[in-house]
Amino acid sequence: MTHQTHAYHMVNPSPWPLTGALSALLMTSGLIMWFHFNSTILLMLGLTTNMLTMYQWWRDVIRESTFQGHHTPNVQKGLRYGMILFIISEVLFFTGFFWAFYHSSLAPTPELGGCWPPTGIHPLNPLEVPLLNTSVLLASGVSITWAHHSLMEGNRNHMLQALFITIALGVYFTLLQASEYYEAPFTISDGVYGSTFFVATGFHGLHVIIGSTFLIVCFFRQLKFHFTSNHHFGFEAAAWYWHFVDVVWLFLYVSIYWWGS
């Protein structure tokens, strides 16, 4: 903050947006190579560069916020607005998937047999793994709230316990989802039902993995005493994101698994 007459953070030039964009290009190109040519080399390269970019960018943000004091109240306010806008954009992203699902299911075309689920599709039982997944995510919503309140009260041990439980539940959800995909009696290529089901639930699963990664970073930061009861926006943003993931799943469960079956 030396030689500065304002409370805002002037970010130094960083290579990570460029490497992040390149890793995204490599991953999307790698997916095409994997789908069409059964080659995972480009995809693995993209994932590796993405992981390296995430690690180093997160490291820089932690340095700037925790050790250099750049995250003043004004900067934190801007970050909060940014996170809110990001979550709104994610809501609109998922709105597109729900629109596709309801557009197809509320007025099934003759090609689908005039019914929903389409003729020949055997949907998953919503009272089996999907209901367990719902319980797991709802429980994780409770534990992340417990972690947040413990942090605000300065109870470090309870915060760590609650955060660990949330991460464990997030990983468990991902494993359950993977087993459900493996055992599903239909695939992404089974018409509009398969494509809307796997794209909507798959993108939600990706968001759970991203949210779990965010929480794991917060867990290690808390182990190193990075958060205080009044300076913990990194954790707060992760908690907001996790609640968003939780709410989206409830809509997915009610729409696609329960009503759609």
Curated annotation (Swiss-Prot):
<keyword id="KW-0472">Membrane</keyword>
<feature type="topological domain" description="Mitochondrial intermembrane">
    <location>
        <begin position="257"/>
        <end position="261"/>
    </location>
</feature>
<comment type="similarity">
    <text>Belongs to the cytochrome c oxidase subunit 3 family.</text>
</comment>
<dbReference type="GO" id="GO:0006123">
    <property type="term" value="P:mitochondrial electron transport, cytochrome c to oxygen"/>
</dbReference>
<dbReference type="InterPro" id="IPR013833">
    <property type="entry name" value="Cyt_c_oxidase_su3_a-hlx"/>
</dbReference>
<feature type="transmembrane region" description="Helical; Name=VII">
    <location>
        <begin position="233"/>
        <end position="256"/>
    </location>
</feature>
<feature type="topological domain" description="Mitochondrial matrix">
    <location>
        <begin position="1"/>
        <end position="15"/>
    </location>
</feature>
<feature type="topological domain" description="Mitochondrial matrix">
    <location>
        <begin position="153"/>
        <end position="155"/>
    </location>
</feature>
<keyword id="KW-1133">Transmembrane helix</keyword>
<feature type="transmembrane region" description="Helical; Name=II">
    <location>
        <begin position="41"/>
        <end position="66"/>
    </location>
</feature>
<feature type="topological domain" description="Mitochondrial matrix">
    <location>
        <begin position="67"/>
        <end position="72"/>
    </location>
</feature>
<feature type="transmembrane region" description="Helical; Name=I">
    <location>
        <begin position="16"/>
        <end position="34"/>
    </location>
</feature>
<protein>
    <recommendedName>
        <fullName>Cytochrome c oxidase subunit 3</fullName>
        <ecNumber>7.1.1.9</ecNumber>
    </recommendedName>
</protein>
<feature type="transmembrane region" description="Helical; Name=IV">
    <location>
        <begin position="129"/>
        <end position="152"/>
    </location>
</feature>
<dbReference type="GO" id="GO:0045277">
    <property type="term" value="C:respiratory chain complex IV"/>
</dbReference>
<keyword id="KW-1278">Translocase</keyword>
<dbReference type="GO" id="GO:0008535">
    <property type="term" value="P:respiratory chain complex IV assembly"/>
</dbReference>
<dbReference type="Pfam" id="PF00510">
    <property type="entry name" value="COX3"/>
</dbReference>
<comment type="subunit">
    <text>Component of the cytochrome c oxidase (complex IV, CIV), a multisubunit enzyme composed of 14 subunits. The complex is composed of a catalytic core of 3 subunits MT-CO1, MT-CO2 and MT-CO3, encoded in the mitochondrial DNA, and 11 supernumerary subunits COX4I, COX5A, COX5B, COX6A, COX6B, COX6C, COX7A, COX7B, COX7C, COX8 and NDUFA4, which are encoded in the nuclear genome.</text>
</comment>
<feature type="topological domain" description="Mitochondrial intermembrane">
    <location>
        <begin position="184"/>
        <end position="190"/>
    </location>
</feature>
<feature type="topological domain" description="Mitochondrial intermembrane">
    <location>
        <begin position="106"/>
        <end position="128"/>
    </location>
</feature>
<keyword id="KW-0496">Mitochondrion</keyword>
<keyword id="KW-0999">Mitochondrion inner membrane</keyword>
<dbReference type="InterPro" id="IPR024791">
    <property type="entry name" value="Cyt_c/ubiquinol_Oxase_su3"/>
</dbReference>
<dbReference type="InterPro" id="IPR000298">
    <property type="entry name" value="Cyt_c_oxidase-like_su3"/>
</dbReference>
<comment type="function">
    <text>Component of the cytochrome c oxidase, the last enzyme in the mitochondrial electron transport chain which drives oxidative phosphorylation. The respiratory chain contains 3 multisubunit complexes succinate dehydrogenase (complex II, CII), ubiquinol-cytochrome c oxidoreductase (cytochrome b-c1 complex, complex III, CIII) and cytochrome c oxidase (complex IV, CIV), that cooperate to transfer electrons derived from NADH and succinate to molecular oxygen, creating an electrochemical gradient over the inner membrane that drives transmembrane transport and the ATP synthase.</text>
</comment>
<dbReference type="InterPro" id="IPR033945">
    <property type="entry name" value="Cyt_c_oxase_su3_dom"/>
</dbReference>
<dbReference type="GO" id="GO:0004129">
    <property type="term" value="F:cytochrome-c oxidase activity"/>
</dbReference>
<feature type="topological domain" description="Mitochondrial intermembrane">
    <location>
        <begin position="35"/>
        <end position="40"/>
    </location>
</feature>
<keyword id="KW-0812">Transmembrane</keyword>
<feature type="transmembrane region" description="Helical; Name=V">
    <location>
        <begin position="156"/>
        <end position="183"/>
    </location>
</feature>
<dbReference type="GO" id="GO:0005743">
    <property type="term" value="C:mitochondrial inner membrane"/>
</dbReference>
<feature type="transmembrane region" description="Helical; Name=VI">
    <location>
        <begin position="191"/>
        <end position="223"/>
    </location>
</feature>
<feature type="topological domain" description="Mitochondrial matrix">
    <location>
        <begin position="224"/>
        <end position="232"/>
    </location>
</feature>
<feature type="transmembrane region" description="Helical; Name=III">
    <location>
        <begin position="73"/>
        <end position="105"/>
    </location>
</feature>
<dbReference type="InterPro" id="IPR035973">
    <property type="entry name" value="Cyt_c_oxidase_su3-like_sf"/>
</dbReference>
